[in-house]
Amino acid sequence: MPLKSLGNIDPMKPILMFDMDGTLLDLAFDDLIWNTKLPERHAETHDCSLEQSQATLKAFYQQHNHTLCWYSSKYWTEKVGVDVLKLQYDFKNKIAPRIGCFELLEELKAQGYRCWLLTNADQAGLKLKLENVDLSPYFEVMISSEEIGYSKEFVEFWQILQQKHPFDPKHACMVDDTALVLKGAEQFGIPHLLTISQPSSGRPERHALEMEYPAINRLTELFTFLNAIKNKDVDVKTA
């Protein structure tokens, strides 16, 4: 999606880059689709047991995890013989923001932060989510990895993103619930990285020892992290 001006922008503040599913939106929807509804629909379509369907899909998932295929509804429709995008639309009422999502975005907008939405969801999936939870007023850049040609786990994603939308990685912050994505961002040179302790309301909160990066749960906790970055920058400049 093209760059858009949001008005009250402070160029001295870091660009804030957000994942969508499991970060701004509750991952419970995706868990429902991929772990429950797709196995059920697959079993019905192929006249097999639910257990057989779950085993088949699990093998497919493991084969393609963290690739562009993993995030493509078109690919999965062809692979498993179920219209995966239609399946998501059938349960679109389950799409929901995480706690504090709009409270955070409203305040970031008021404070003049530049916010980018970077998702591995394909463009059709991004469109579906935005139709049901309108995040677009808060972001000057909204990117699906399908546009880039690499998923966020790969440093090539960040290289191509920078070519399309120039930015200084040292002046950026990335929030994502997936450690491999944060590793890709870190490899590219983004120093400020945060994860999410409970991406899905349907699963328990992850323990700090399970996570490789600093974590927040309620999204408004991000302000504590941003204040720490600001204070660190002040300390460096005055040293």
Which stretches of residues belong to each language-model region?
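Substrate-recognition element of Asp-dependent hydrolases with the DxDx(T/V) motif
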Residues: 82-96, 101-133, 141-145
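Short glycine/serine/threonine/alanine-rich loop segments
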Residues: 48, 82, 113, 167, ...
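Asp-based, Mg2+/Mn2+-dependent phosphohydrolase catalytic module
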Residues: 1-16, 106, 122-123, 127-239
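N-terminal helical cap/lid subdomain that shapes the substrate entry/recognition surface
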Residues: 6-103, 124
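Flexible coil/turn residues that form the inter-helical turn or adjacent wing/linker of helix-turn-helix
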Residues: 69, 111, 178
